[in-house]
């Protein structure tokens, strides 16, 4: 049994070798000749999986180690009788922590308290729900927009997108990309919506590039609209609008979900799905794969305020480390993908063990996802 895996899927070679012969290949462009005798294909979001790639090939199963699936033609796979699995929620924690790293950087730079801001969350799935929970743990007001969930009657006080634009100081997008249909998200943030945002608002896109109309956004910024922008995703990736990058406050190369934990979850989820598909079901404990974190433990004295939280968050991950490299190479062919391929290891907050002498600080840090314990000072 031959299994092709994306060369940038951590732990893929070790895990899938339990099931068959493993060959690691680039995801973009994928070497088509390798598909001629392969039984399974494991990809990331950079690989377009459709009829033109797989027609006439012996592939029986496709797995994508990503939460999003807009790069996969699921309908064609089903029609062709090819098994499929994604990894929903695998990188949700990573994306939430990316948003926090960005907001805390902007708050320090511009001198505001997050408690004074209302956050509008567009898309309340795996990422949106976790973001809502962590913001509300800090006492920050959230507004939710998710028409599909509202129409299904899911629990939540859902508002319209226009209402969020009018009332939110921060608008952050966490939706799939739907190019048509009743819940179309292509250019969900169009010129009209962008112009309707509150003066000084913060716009964040960490889902799919085309959810925000990049041309319209650049037009608004060029005309002097007071708006802070955080973009991790871009229309036309791996190409991007260099002029737009110059205008945004934080720009990164589609790495919001790129924690080691998030990548490992993606790999293990599709590994478990494929092992079940072939009748040799196996399960993997994530902590058996992950290395020891760079920072083992630290001690925190006193209560948790915003500056202290910012220092803790940026100790684990400071978004500026990914902004600067993109600006240096933007517009150079191949460099966007190279930044992603050679991405510096990044961990999640749970990797940091925090010893607190303040019980409320320990409790709050645990709610936020840190590994915190209370030890009273002696």
UniProtKB/Swiss-Prot annotation:
It is an enzyme of class 1 (oxidoreductase). It is found in: Cytoplasm. Pathway: Cofactor biosynthesis; pyridoxine 5'-phosphate biosynthesis; pyridoxine 5'-phosphate from D-erythrose 4-phosphate: step 2/5. GO terms for cellular component: cytosol. CDD domains: ErythrP_dh. NAD(+) binds at residues 146, 175, 232, 257. GO terms for molecular function: 4-phosphoerythronate dehydrogenase activity; NAD binding; protein dimerization activity. GO terms for biological process: 'de novo' pyridoxal 5'-phosphate biosynthetic process; pyridoxine biosynthetic process. The active site is at residues 208, 237, 254. Its EC number is 1.1.1.290. It catalyses: 4-phospho-D-erythronate + NAD(+) = (R)-3-hydroxy-2-oxo-4-phosphooxybutanoate + NADH + H(+). Keywords: Cytoplasm, NAD, Oxidoreductase, Pyridoxine biosynthesis. Substrate binds at residues 45, 66, 258. Belongs to the D-isomer specific 2-hydroxyacid dehydrogenase family. PdxB subfamily. Catalyzes the oxidation of erythronate-4-phosphate to 3-hydroxy-2-oxo-4-phosphonooxybutanoate. Homodimer. This is Erythronate-4-phosphate dehydrogenase. It comes from Escherichia coli O81 (strain ED1a). The gene is pdxB.
């Amino acid at each position: 049994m031959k299994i092709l895996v994306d060369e940038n899927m951590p732990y893929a070679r070790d895990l899938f070798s339990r099931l068959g012969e493993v060959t690691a290949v680039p995801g973009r462009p994928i070497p088509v000749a390798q598909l001629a005798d392969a039984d399974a294909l494991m990809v990331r979001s950079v690989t377009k999986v459709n009829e033109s790639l797989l027609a006439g090939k012996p592939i029986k199963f496709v797995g994508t180690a990503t939460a999003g699936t807009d790069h996969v033609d699921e309908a064609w796979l089903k029609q062709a009788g090819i098994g499929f699995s994604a990894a929903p929620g695998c990188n949700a924690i990573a994306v939430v922590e990316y948003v926090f790293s960005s907001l805390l950087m902007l708050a320090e730079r511009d001198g505001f308290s997050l408690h004074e801001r209302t956050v509008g969350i567009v898309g309340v799935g795996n990422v949106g729900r976790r973001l809502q929970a962590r913001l509300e743990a800090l006492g920050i007001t959230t507004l939710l927009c998710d028409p599909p969930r509202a129409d299904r009657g899911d629990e939540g006080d859902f508002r319209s997108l226009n209402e969020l634009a009018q009332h939110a100081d921060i608008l952050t997008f966490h939706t799939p990309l739907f190019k048509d249909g009743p819940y179309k998200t292509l250019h969900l943030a169009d010129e009209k919506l962008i112009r309707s945002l509150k003066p000084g608002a913060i716009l964040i896109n960490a889902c799919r590039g085309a959810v925000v109309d990049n041309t319209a956004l650049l037009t608004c910024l060029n005309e002097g609209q007071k708006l802070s922008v955080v973009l991790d995703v871009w229309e036309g990736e791996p190409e991007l609008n260099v002029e737009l990058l110059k205008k945004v406050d934080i720009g990164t190369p589609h790495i919001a979900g790129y924690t080691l934990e998030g990548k490992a979850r993606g790999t293990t989820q599709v590994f478990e799905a494929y092992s079940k598909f072939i009748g040799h079901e196996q399960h993997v404990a994530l902590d058996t794969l992950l290395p020891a974190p760079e920072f083992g433990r630290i001690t925190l004295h006193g209560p948790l305020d915003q500056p202290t939280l910012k220092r803790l968050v940026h100790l684990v991950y400071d978004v500026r480390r990914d902004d600067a490299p993109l600006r240096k190479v933007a517009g150079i062919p191949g460099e966007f993908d190279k930044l992603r391929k050679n991405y510096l290891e990044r961990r999640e907050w749970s990797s940091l063990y925090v010893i607190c002498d303040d019980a409320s600080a320990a409790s709050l840090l645990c709610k936020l996802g840190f590994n915190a314990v209370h030890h009273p000072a002696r």
